[in-house]
C-alpha cells in the first residue's frame, strides 16, 4: 500500500482503503481531537501524497501509520489515553516509576516486559482503590 484512497469511521477506529484494495485500521485513541470531533468535522479532510489532514482539527495521519503492527493500544496505553485527567509523569512519581520510561510505554516507543506491565496495571488498580476510599 502506497496511499489511502478512502476513509471511514466505526466506533473508536478509523479505517482506510488502500490503493491495493485492502482495508487498514488504527485506533482513534491515538488522535483524541479526531475521536472527539463531530461527523461534519471528520468529513472535512484532505488527502495528500503522504497522508490525511484535518486542517480545522490540526490532525495529521500518515499513510505509513496504517501499516504499524500495533493498531490496538496496550492496556497501559488505553488507560492513559482514555484518562487524560491522570498525568503520566505525576502517576510515575507517585508510585516511584521512571516518568520518561512510563511516557515511552504510553507513547509506544518502548514495550514493558510482562512483569513490568503487570506491576503498572497493579499500580493503576491501587490508584483506583485510593479514589474509592474518598
Segment roles from a protein language model:
Residues 1-134:
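Motif-centric detector for short Cys/His coordination patterns
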